Amino acid sequence: MKTHRLNMTASLLIGISAFAVQAFASEPTVVPEQPPFPAQGKITYVSRDSILEFKALREYREPEWVTEKFVKAGKLPPVAERLPKEPMVFKAGNMPDGMGVYGDVMRHVIGGRPEGWNYSAGQTQGWGGIDIGMFECLTRTAPLFQVEADDMEPLPNLAKSWDWSEDGRKLTMHLIEGAKWSDGDPFDADDVMFYWEDNVLDSSVSPLNGATPETFGEGTTLKKIDQYTVEWTFKEAFPRQHLFAMAYGTFCPGPSHILKTKHPKYAGTTYNEYKNGFPAEYMNLPVMGAWVPVAYRPDDIIVLRRNPYYWKVDEAGNQLPYLNELHYKLSTWADRDVQAIAGSGDISNLEQPENFVESLKRAANESAPARLAFGPRVIGYNMHMNFSGNGWGDPDERAKAVRELNRNLDFRKAVTMAVDRKKLGEALVKGPFTAIYPGGLSSGTSFYDRNSTIYYPHDLEGAKVLLEKVGLKDTDGNGFVNFPAGKLGGRDVEIVLLVNSDYSTDRNLAEGMVGQMEKLGLRVVLNALDGKQRDAANYAGRFDWMIHRNTAEFASVVQNTPQLAPTGPRTSWHHRAPEGGEVDVMPHEQELVDIVNKFIASNDNDERTELMKQYQKVATTNVDTVGLTEYPGALIINKRFSNIPPGAPIFMFNWAEDTIIRERVFVAADKQGDYELYPEQLPGKPGESGPIN
């Protein structure tokens, strides 16, 4: 086994020879086959109903210290009274290492910083899985990576079941009965309706992860039937695709009994006061997730403790989670990989290829504290051009002229032909990791079809010819093309490229694009912003081009499907409606919209597969995005943890922190360390500092 592992590592580090592309460079062709990748983990596929169920058990258990220090002292009701009528039960047969034991910590390292805890109003908690551990959603999709394709539907979560009307236009959702927020307040339909009516539908509020009314279908409505029942009404029949949008991160309700105290509709405050009413220093915010924030030290650490009212159990009735505490060390994203490999951190999504080689070397050592498992090539980067020609983002005259170019197919072809994707990939990491990616769907999704993926091979001279065709020539001899004399005084074409400065991969790709576009004759300048500012600029339409790491719709197709095209005024990443206006879609975009809407409405698997072939061909032929590179990610996890699913991708329906189902991850008793900062303590009252004994 050791020899095999070392040989596999050696083959990855050495790499493989490049393949030849036999085609006339100026002609579109099918994208080249990707190099084989021998280290990809194998997934064990299961049926959807083998993962969990809802039912009452004869008895329930909790950590002994909770019983002794809190229940017997009268500080908490008995565990059976804290659980819902029928808790969610994770089936032992789907747990790789079976039912676990209580104790220990999972130590995360992140590069983000928390704005506050108001997820519903758009505040980030710092990413890295903090929000995933705190906020639960109506449905759940991350574990679906292991579900057989013909059984693909979201898992129940806060919504334990749902029924369709005979005509398929109404969906009745049954919520878990008797579940409670972490402060003991009941969870019910009022929390769901507050999120929908006073956050998603309120145009002055922008929930984190971008939920809009269109996310759930144009004209969709939601109403409360009773305390534990809500009813959706859709314009189309049986739009099962919207069940995926009810998972992370677009339908994860917050605690209405707390949030209403700051919302303008109920408290007479401003929207800014609502958004910022629960800053990072506000501890013990009630959650439905497995862990509650109890400590925060700026630029140091966030600590979360187990939720005593968590509504999930194992088959023996042990209240989850098994892990008592989560740590989030506030550092950098690159340091996350370093600490996970070194053993001072416990988990990392190895998504920055610059760290691949060193991580492989260290993980190959028998004494390494962490194991490293690669998944499919689902980490991809596109360059998105701003397609709005009618004012999204209030562009000035220069930006308007650039957008006019962006809407020209020959210009887009010139740009994509000028991209040397092989060099971009090798600048990140050498070896069989990166692959040529022309844009469109990820090669890691089951809907990917190579023969439908059109590729314009690298051809700098052909690209320059296309620039001349659209009227761009270097008229002043400085190496950069100029606008025609009648536009902006014939000055140099200057394009601003938006990029996230928090990630080295994003920066490296952006810098590579600046150099490659300079050879084409386009002056590209970087607008490097931290993650929060970069996202704000994106949502506001303040960019010409932007580097964008692919989100779930490209990796899974069934998650966030409306975002594959401008199906609504605020669904596309690079083409949205201006305030009070409409999206001025181009002909190829209308084709994409029609295809995506048909896909959402269809329940025929063969038809859906064919529709995504059409989508891929239209998107890549028309250069809807400029694909840059694609590569696999690897899950780095400390060897002391059990119940890590084999082959778990770091990103498909969601990130690995959700994919591995952290609430059922455990550390065997003989492997547990002394890492808890607040042992035998539970969250205190909302707004009070720290946990309680």
Swiss-Prot record:
Disruption phenotype: Disruption mutant is unable to use melibiose and raffinose as carbon sources but it can use glucose and galactose.
Single Gene Ontology BP annotation: peptide transport
Alphabetic keyword roster: Periplasm, Plasmid, Signal, Sugar transport, Transport
CDD domains attached to this UniProt entry: PBP2_NikA_DppA_OppA_like_4 (cd08500)
Molecular function terms, GO-annotated: peptide transmembrane transporter activity
Cellular localization per UniProt: Periplasm
Main subcellular location: periplasm
Superkingdom of the organism of origin: Bacteria
Any single Gene Ontology cellular-component annotation: outer membrane-bounded periplasmic space
Signal sequence interval, chain numbering: 1-20
Induction: Induced by melibiose, raffinose, galactose, galactosamine, dulcitol and stachyose. Expression is down-regulated by succinate and glucose, and by SyrA.
UniProt family annotation: Belongs to the bacterial solute-binding protein 5 family.
Protein function: Involved in the transport of alpha-galactosides. Required for the utilization of raffinose and melibiose. Probably acts as a periplasmic substrate-binding protein for a transport system.
PANTHER family for the chain: OLIGOPEPTIDE ABC TRANSPORTER, PERIPLASMIC OLIGOPEPTIDE-BINDING PROTEIN, PERIPLASMIC BINDING COMPONENT OF ABC TRANSPORTER
Protein name per the record: Periplasmic alpha-galactoside-binding protein
